[in-house]
Design a protein with these regions (language model features):
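Structural alpha/beta core scaffold segments of enzyme domains
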Residues: 1-535, 629-632, 645, 649-654
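Amphipathic, heptad-repeat alpha-helical segments used for oligomerization and assembly
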Residues: 245, 410, 414, 598-616
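Active-site "cap" helix and flanking loop/linker of ATP-utilizing ligase/carboxylase catalytic domains
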Residues: 304, 545, 549-581
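A glycine-rich dinucleotide-binding beta-alpha-beta segment and adjacent secondary-structure elements
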Residues: 326-340, 574-593, 602
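C-terminal substrate/ligand-recognition segments
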Residues: 376, 515, 520, 560-565, ...
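Generic long, charged, amphipathic alpha-helical segments
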Residues: 392-398, 586-609
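Cytochrome P450 core scaffold surrounding the K-helix E-X-X-R motif
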Residues: 539-543
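Membrane-interface anchoring segments and C-terminal beta-barrel signals
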Residues: 640-642, 658
Length: 658
């Protein structure tokens, strides 16, 4: 046989590469992008008051530079796809895909085929963390192209080295902060400049950096802000979506800076946050007034610090002086707020289909994709709750792009929030159909019909009746009225002005706090995180075990970002090809984790829920950084918090030893 690669002829012209984002933005830099007049991928702004003037009158100004590098998603299942050509010309596509609808859109553009001839199947994915979008769709597109060409099924499964080399990474950030404080510790102004490396292609960096801009000052009141968040194209590995999506980087900077400011102002870490954190009715840096949901920063911070005993233990920190056993002890915490859903990036929506069967079983499908986060379980729980039936009746069908309308991609911790919104709408519609049909036959009013405990009944008035769910379905089919409904949920309106960075970028927020205790071996320098306490207000918790699992997983994944994961890139080439050269946390590295639920049902969410996948990860790095400072007496502005190591395209950065 002939190897496919032997049939490919390559013609390429050597050009001068650019590996540093600053160099890419020089006026005489060669153009690296297919669109645009320069290498500036995006520029997001926040303008509030006169920040420079306010800094001139500040009692204390802290000026710091922070760096984060490239990070690999490290999903267990590599990219892969199988494509079957059908006799009718349709291509049937399976794969490790994060968003089948966008995969269909990409393949349709590549192959110049109509959507109707591309059916992409929605299967659970063996890990994604934001990484199974662009690259995974490209793999599916190659399988589709080959299948179309040879007229036979084609399977492509990536080896780990291929996955490392081709997949996009978390974008490296250089963050320059100048923040002014009053004598009592109140934040007065912030001037922020952030530069991200988008790499050789533009993926989702324009949107992740937008979130960074909207949340660049953390969950605090700052009356004067000038923030510029930019991304540049380079010849490095391309970057894109990763769990946290622009928040972990700025949270690391802000929460590290807040602890340092507290120390220099003679305040405790708790006091400076209480003075500055957002409360009910406060305005954010973008001018959004938080008055339509519960602002619970003080609740989550109090829950975490009391549970871990922060105020009692902070005085026991080593500050560079080893204990008798040769170890250094430290404790730290961090808080955050995170906009739920995709916000003003795009109009967010989701869909659901519910189809009640003659035998009492129920089929349901949604536009939410299962990436291992437990989305299907959450949808089933919500449907069972609204219909008043047992979960065992409900079968969550793995849909295709031909069966359920677009429901948005599984990103931005939007699955539970948007998915349950569509589920509630579909369930309410099918309940109305059932109620109207049964009352027409048995008497009563539709609004008086109750659904609970696998029964449908009217318990008051002259026309009371009671029947099992199975009996109700039999009546529905006798009447030839089909208990089927399509539901949808569209996120409430949001707003954003690109020139000023003003508006309401998200319709609601998740509030979070995490605290960490750690021990450092003073001789070897190794760090062991021993205890983590996490409190998150993500609205109504649909599935408590999965809620806790998401948080535990996010914490351990975030520990890798904080302490060990250092993806080295040389002249645009990734040096690691497997996990022997890229150190992710192991099970033995996991600390004791205590999860505290702070539940304030969200009035703008049909089911009262928000999301937890990304808030779980975005705080542990600054909590560890603050704990590490109290252990060693040295503060680092880089991630990972290793004594040596590269920091993305900026190379080796001198560690701050202040």
């Amino acid at each position: 046989g002939v190897e496919g690669a032997e049939l490919v002829e390559l013609s390429a012209e050597d050009l001068e590469p650019i590996f540093h984002p600053d160099d890419a933005l020089e006026s005489d830099a060669p153009l690296l992008r297919a669109v645009g007049e320069d290498n500036l991928v995006c520029h997001h702004k926040v303008r509030r008051g006169d920040a420079e003037a306010a800094l001139e009158h500040a009692h204390l100004i802290i000026e710091k530079e922070f760096h984060t590098g490239w990070f690999e998603h490290a999903y267990m299942e590599p990219e892969g796809s199988v494509c079957f050509p059908r006799q009718d010309g349709t291509l049937e596509i399976y794969g490790s895909l994060q968003h089948p609808v966008s995969t269909r859109r990409f393949i349709a553009a590549w192959l110049a085929m109509p959507y109707s001839l591309l059916e992409v199947f929605n299967h659970p994915v063996g890990g994604s963390f934001g990484g199974k979008d662009d690259t995974a769709s490209a793999v599916a597109g190659r399988a589709a192209l080959a299948a179309l060409g040879v007229g036979r099924p084609v399977k492509i499964i990536y080896e780990r080295e291929w996955s490392f080399r081709e997949s996009y990474k978390r974008p490296p950030y250089r963050m320059r902060y100048r923040v002014g404080f009053g004598s009592a510790g109140e934040m007065e102004a912030a001037v922020i400049d952030i530069l991200a490396d988008s790499g050789a292609y533009t993926s989702t960096v324009p949107w992740s950096t937008w979130r960074s801009a909207a949340q660049c000052c953390g969950p605090y009141r700052v009356p004067a802000v000038r923030a510029d968040v930019r991304a540049a194209a380079t010849n490095n590995v391309f970057t894109g979506a990763f769990r946290g999506f622009g928040s972990p980087q700025v949270n690391f900077a802000v929460e590290s800076l807040m602890d340092e400011a507290a120390e220099r102002l003679g305040l405790t870490a708790l006091e400076i946050r209480r003075k500055n954190m957002l409360h009910q009715g406060d305005a954010t840096i973008t001018g959004q007034v938080l008055d339509d949901h519960t602002v619970s920063l003080d609740q989550v911070m109090r829950a975490v610090t009391e549970e871990i005993g922060f105020e009692e233990k902070v005085g026991q920190c080593s500050m560079g002086h080893p204990r008798e056993d040769g170890t250094l002890y430290g404790i730290g915490f961090a808080i955050s707020y995170r906009g739920a859903s995709v916000g003003a990036e795009a109009k967010d929506f989701c869909s659901c289909v519910v189809n009640c069967q003659f035998d009492g079983s129920i089929l349901m499908e949604t536009g939410i994709h299962e990436n291992g986060q437990g989305a299907q379980s959450a949808m089933i729980l919500a449907m069972a709750d609204v219909l008043g039936v047992s979960m065992e009746r409900i079968h969550y069908a793995e849909s295709t792009t031909s069966q359920v309308p677009e429901g948005g991609t599984t990103v931005a911790s939007r699955g539970t929030l948007m998915g349950t919104g569509a589920v509630v709408d579909a369930a309410d519609k099918v309940k109305a159909i059932i109620a109207d049909t049964l009352t027409e036959k048995l008497g009563g009013k539709g609004e008086d019909v109750m659904f609970a405990d696998d029964r449908v009944f009217v318990g008051t008035g002259d026309h009371s009746w009671d029947m099992s769910w199975d009996e109700a379905m039999a009546v529905m089919y006798e009447q030839r009225v089909y208990p089927f409904a399509f539901g949808s949920f569209k996120a409430p309106e949001v707003s954003w002005d690109d020139e000023t960075g003003r508006g309401s970028p998200y319709f609601t927020y998740v509030y979070s706090a995490q605290a960490a205790e750690l021990v450092v071996d003073a001789e070897r320098g190794s760090v062991s995180v021993t205890q983590v306490v996490a409190a998150h207000d993500s609205g109504r918790v649909v599935n408590p075990p999965l809620f806790e699992g998401q948080i535990a997983g996010g914490i351990v994944q975030g520990m890798g970002m904080a302490l060990s994961e250092d993806l080295k890139v040389e002249s645009g080439r990734i040096l690691a090809g497997n996990y022997n050269a890229y150190k992710i946390p192991k099970s033995i590295d996991a600390p004791n984790i205590t999860v505290l639920r702070v539940e304030n049902s969200d009035p703008l969410s049909p089911y009262g829920s928000k999301g937890i996948g990304e808030p779980a990860l975005e705080l542990i790095a600054p909590a560890i950084a603050n704990a590490l400072y109290r252990a060693t007496g040295r503060r680092s502005g880089t991630l990972p918090l290793t004594p040596k190591g590269s920091v993305g395209p900026w190379g080796s950065v001198e560690k701050d030893k202040s």
